[in-house]
Amino acid sequence: MNKFGNFFRAEEELHVPGVGADIEIMADDEKNLEVLRYSSATDSTLGLLFENGAHGREFLAYTLEDEFREEKVSAETRIPEGTYDVKLRTVGGFHSRYLDKFGADFHKGMLHVQDVPGFEYILIHTGNTEEHTMGCLLVADTSQQNITKDGFIGASVNAYKRIYPSLAQWLADGNKLTITYIDYDNPRN
């Protein structure tokens, strides 16, 4: 036991059992978003979005995605667990609508999850229910359970406006951004 009452030495890595990947302090030019999926239901998956950067882990928002499916159904299935690059997408309908909605000073491109096997155009955007996901990741400031009724997240635009600028600027500055999806909800059971 060290002087802080812990059973590990300061130079050892910290491991949080059952919560996915070890907490890793990232390099100054790298950030990793982490989606901890905690509740699967018939039509939706609820999660928590964290940012891992040079200063550790920070909670950003609640998330909502489509449900888990063994066989993909277009725009009705959450993406597989794993780590993916995120880039800015500056074409397409969502990009045009967000330019109109938020203006060019704010909106620099959609946060686009890259190279997901069997999926295209996976974006991080606003919305409240699984009907708004189209297979993408929705972010919000509030969350309601999806056990006895359909999943719902609220204040989505507020959350997006809070987290988007720093992530978009990070990417615009040429830094690396990844996102890791962790299935803590164990949907296969």
Regions found by a protein language model. Give the residues of each.
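Cell wall/extracellular polymer interaction/catalysis modules
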Residues: 5-177, 182-188
